[in-house]
Amino acid sequence: MQIEISANSRKLHGTGANRRLRSQGRLPGVIYGGNGDAQSIELDHKDLYYKLKMEAFHASILSISIDGKKEQVLLRDVQMHPFKQQVLHIDFQRVRQDQKIHVKVPLHFINADIAPGVKLSGGMISHVATEIEISCLPKDLPEFITVDLSGMTAGSTLHLSDLILSENVEIPALLKGDNLPVATLIAKRGEAGESSEE
């Protein structure tokens, strides 16, 4: 299910205009890229604030309706107030179906409890990364990538090359030769000493 956003064109610009907009419960933003010019928009702050809490909102193709005209976009940047629960500005990028996009998607770790290094050795899994950058066409964009930890033993590490990706999805870091760690299983401290004392 695609997430939909409603917006309106924004005519007034500048700090004063944006402050007035926020006082009315509206949020200034911009949409750029694709085949169109950059366009200033305004959105409902409350609606966007709650959508930003959705994981999928950050790693999905979104449908934005600007004055009734729909476009496909990606969330690119969010500026938050330093201490208030307030979004100050939001950026979206248009996507073209025939053009690859680079997006950070979250990692969902599963089966940690049945990993031999946890179940048998009492080790602990450390998530080195919680998201990774991928490259693909918009139609192939996954909401998340599942990381199966069931085979991990004490002292082992899962790398980017161990991730199972759907077809047509690439990890740019791997193409550059950077096979970065994703998760490690840390052995229980003093395990060897404890077993020898017994």
Curated annotation (Swiss-Prot):
SUPFAM superfamilies: Ribosomal protein L25-like
Entries under CDD domains matching the protein: Ribosomal_L25_TL5_CTC (cd00495)
One matching Pfam family: Ribosomal_L25p
InterPro entries tied to this protein: Rbsml_bL25/Gln-tRNA_synth_N, Ribosomal_bL25/Gln-tRNA_synth, Ribosomal_bL25_b-dom, Ribosomal_bL25_C, Ribosomal_bL25_long, Ribosomal_bL25_short, Ribosomal_L25_dom, Ribosomal_uL5_bac-type
Presence of the UniProt keyword Ribonucleoprotein in the record: yes
Ribosomal protein recorded as keyword: yes
GO molecular function: 5S rRNA binding; structural constituent of ribosome
UniProt entry keywords in alphabetical sequence: Ribonucleoprotein, Ribosomal protein, RNA-binding, rRNA-binding
GO terms for biological process, alphabetical: translation
GO cellular component, one term: cytosolic large ribosomal subunit
Similarity-based family: Belongs to the bacterial ribosomal protein bL25 family. CTC subfamily.
Function: This is one of the proteins that binds to the 5S RNA in the ribosome where it forms part of the central protuberance.
Subunit structure of this chain's protein: Part of the 50S ribosomal subunit; part of the 5S rRNA/L5/L18/L25 subcomplex. Contacts the 5S rRNA. Binds to the 5S rRNA independently of L5 and L18.
The name this protein goes by in its record: Large ribosomal subunit protein bL25
Source species of the chain: Nitrosomonas europaea (strain ATCC 19718 / CIP 103999 / KCTC 2705 / NBRC 14298)
